[in-house]
Curated annotation (Swiss-Prot):
Lineage: Bacteria, Bacillati, Actinomycetota, Actinomycetes, Acidothermales
Biological function: Catalyzes the hydrolysis of futalosine (FL) to dehypoxanthine futalosine (DHFL) and hypoxanthine, a step in the biosynthesis of menaquinone (MK, vitamin K2). Cannot directly use aminodeoxyfutalosine (AFL) as a substrate.
SUPFAM superfamilies: Purine and uridine phosphorylases
E.C. code: 3.2.2.26
UniProt cross-references to CDD domains, sorted A to Z: futalosine_nucleosidase_MqnB
Protein name in UniProt: Futalosine hydrolase
Annotated catalysed reactions: futalosine + H2O = dehypoxanthine futalosine + hypoxanthine
Entry keywords, A to Z: Hydrolase, Menaquinone biosynthesis
Membership in a protein family: Belongs to the PNP/UDP phosphorylase family. Futalosine hydrolase subfamily.
NCBIfam families noted in UniProt: fut_nucase, PRK08236.1
Database matches in Pfam families: PNP_UDP_1 (PF01048)
Gene Ontology CC terms, in alphabetical order: cytosol
InterPro entries reported for this sequence: FL_hydrolase_MqnB, Nucleoside_phosphorylase_d, Nucleoside_phosphorylase_sf
Length: 244
C-alpha cells in the first residue's frame, strides 16, 4: 500500500515551492499543469477557495489511497503569527460559515444546523511540527481560519481575534480539504507560511516571495523526515530517482 501524501495548494506558485522543497518533482504523465509528483507526495493545484479545494481533494482521494492530506500555501497571520512564520493548524475553523445577526456572527453550531468543529489529530500536528523543529524552523501552532472573503479591515481582524482567540492564520481552502479528507477517512493537516498580517489591506507590507521561500524550506525539512523514516523509501520506488 502506498504511503504517499497528498498536498493541496490553491495556486501553482505554492505547488512549485513545495515541489522544490521536496526535491525531484516529476511532470504528470498526462502533462497536467495541476499535478506535481515527488517520491513522497503528490502535489495538486486545486484552485482558490474552499469549494474548489474540497472538490479537487475528493476527486484525488477517489483515484488512489494517500496516508495524509496536507493543505498548504501562504496565509495572513493573526495573533502571535508574524510575517515569515510557519504555522501549523491544531484546528480548522470555517470563520464565515453561519449567519449574521444584530449581535454579530453566529456559527452553524450555535444555530443548531451542523457542526463545523475540525480539530487536527495531535499525531498529525506532531508529524508536521517535529521535523520543522528539528530543522530549527520554530513553527507556530494554533487554529487556521478558512474564509471566503479575506479580511481587509482592522475592525474585521479584531472580530476574528475575539471569536477565535487561538487562531494564528487566515486562508481560503483548509476547511474544504478537511471535509473531503474526513469523509474519505484520511488524516489531514494544514501548514501555512504567513505572507502578511490580517487587517487593513496594505500590499506594500506583504512579503509573498519570502513566504514562498519559507514554504520551500518547510517542505525540505518534511521531505527529509519522510525519506528517512523508511516509509519514504518505499514510496520512492514509484518515482525514478527516489528519495535523495
Amino acid at each position: 500500500m502506498s504511503v504517499k501524501r497528498l498536498i493541496i495548494t490553491a495556486v501553482a506558485a505554492e505547488a512549485d515551492a513545495v515541489a522544490s522543497g521536496l526535491d525531484g518533482a516529476q511532470p504528470h504523465p498526462q502533462g497536467s499543469a495541476n499535478v506535481r509528483h515527488t517520491a513522497t507526495a503528490d502535489i495538486l493545484v486545486a484552485g482558490v477557495g474552499s469549494a474548489a479545494a474540497a472538490a479537487a481533494t475528493a476527486a484525488a482521494l477517489a483515484r488512489r489511497h494517500y496516508s495524509l492530506v496536507i493543505c498548504t500555501g501562504i496565509a495572513g497571520g493573526i495573533g502571535i503569527a508574524g510575517i515569515g512564520d510557519i504555522v501549523v493548524a491544531d484546528a480548522v475553523h470555517p470563520a464565515d460559515l453561519g449567519a449574521m445577526s444584530p449581535d454579530g456572527f453566529i456559527p452553524l453550531e450555535h444555530l443548531g444546523i451542523a457542526t463545523t468543529a475540525n480539530a487536527i489529530d495531535p499525531p498529525v500536528v506532531e508529524e508536521l511540527t517535529g521535523p520543522l523543529r528539528y530543522a530549527g524552523l520554530a513553527p507556530v501552532i494554533g487554529g487556521i481560519l478558512t474564509v471566503n472573503t479575506v479580511t481587509g479591515t482592522d475592525a474585521h481582524a479584531d472580530d476574528l481575534r475575539r471569536r477565535y482567540p487561538g487562531a494564528v492564520a487566515e486562508a481560503m481552502e483548509g476547511y474544504g480539504v478537511a471535509v473531503a479528507a474526513t469523509r474519505a477517512g484520511v488524516r489531514y493537516g494544514e501548514l501555512r507560511v504567513v505572507s502578511n498580517r490580517v487587517g487593513r489591506r496594505d500590499r506594500r507590507a506583504w512579503d509573498i516571495p519570502g513566504a514562498l521561500r519559507r514554504l520551500e524550506h518547510a517542505f525540505a525539512a518534511l521531505g527529509a523526515a519522510w525519506c528517512n523514516d523508511g516509509s519514504g523509501q518505499a514510496a520512492a520506488r514509484e518515482i525514478d530517482g527516489g528519495c535523495p
